[in-house]
Design a protein with these regions (language model features):
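Internal/C-terminal transmembrane anchor helices
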Residues: 29-57
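Active-site recognition of the HExxH zinc-binding catalytic motif
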Residues: 130-158
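Active-site scaffold of zinc-dependent metalloenzymes
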Residues: 90-133, 140-143
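Short extracytoplasmic
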Residues: 68-101
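Metalloprotease/metallohydrolase-associated module, dominated by Zn2+-dependent proteases
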Residues: 2, 7-21, 34-38, 55, ...
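Cys/His-rich zinc-coordinating "finger/knuckle" motifs
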Residues: 87, 119, 211
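Membrane-helix interface linkers and caps
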Residues: 20-30
């Protein structure tokens, strides 16, 4: 909101400059000519301050549409929390959270930025960027209705390939990214233990109890 307020202030400065060239200001007999450098500066600043918020709004809408598809058309509304939002969030220690009743998904700072970074170079994705993809898929599964964390995570693991493709990642790269997360990030949860073990199940494997046998599953043969 502060970014938008700053942008509106510079828009007002631009408006005042243009209006001053059309209508004489109090105490002057004629309008003043427009100061082109000043007008250009305030317009650039208006756009620069508006961009972070506008980009976040666009990205949230983009993610909401894809999350809805992942959640079998249960309506999802993704909100990318700013640092301030995250600090005030009762679930600030979680990377994300979702309410299946409202469809609202909150992704904590900085994970939306990490996901955006992943989408800019998926063929060079690091472990953290692959985790951001899984967070998005995981919360979409909550909107779908599953609340058990280990089952939800297994549903996400099987759909990360689908999620990556919905987000615009090329097929071959999406498959590799999804498998990399399953073989590395997901298996690491078992090794770390503690709270991470709540997101892991030995039955989350091809042919085991949690295998949904999806035609486009992460681990399905091409």
């Amino acid at each position: 909101m502060l970014w938008i307020l700053a942008s509106l202030f510079f828009c007002w400065c631009a408006y005042r400059e243009i209006r001053g060239s059309l209508v004489a200001r109090p105490g002057f007999d004629s309008p003043a000519p427009v100061s082109t450098p000043y007008l250009a500066l305030v317009l650039v600043l208006a756009v620069a301050f508006a961009w972070p918020t506008v980009h976040r709004w666009y990205f949230q809408r983009f993610l909401s549409i894809r999350a809805t598809l992942l959640a079998d058309n249960h309506r999802a509304i993704v909100h990318c929390n700013t640092l301030f939002d995250t600090m005030l969030d009762p679930e600030m220690l979680a990377a994300g959270h979702a309410n299946p009743l409202t469809g609202k998904i909150g992704i904590q700072s900085p994970w939306c930025n990490v996901l955006s970074s992943y989408l800019s170079h998926p063929n060079r994705a690091d472990d953290r960027e692959l985790q951001s993809l899984d967070i998005f898929t995981h919360e979409s599964m909550h909107v779908r209705g599953e609340m058990n964390e280990s089952i939800t995570e297994c549903e996400a693991v099987q759909r990360n390939y689908r999620a990556a493709k919905l987000l615009g990642v090329a097929d071959e790269t999406a498959k590799k990214n999804a498998l990399d997360y399953y073989n590395n990030g997901y298996q690491l949860r078992r090794k770390i233990g503690g709270i991470q073990s709540a997101y892991y199940s030995e039955q989350c494997s091809p042919g085991k109890a949690l295998d949904e046998h999806l035609s486009d599953s992460t681990w399905a043969a091409p």
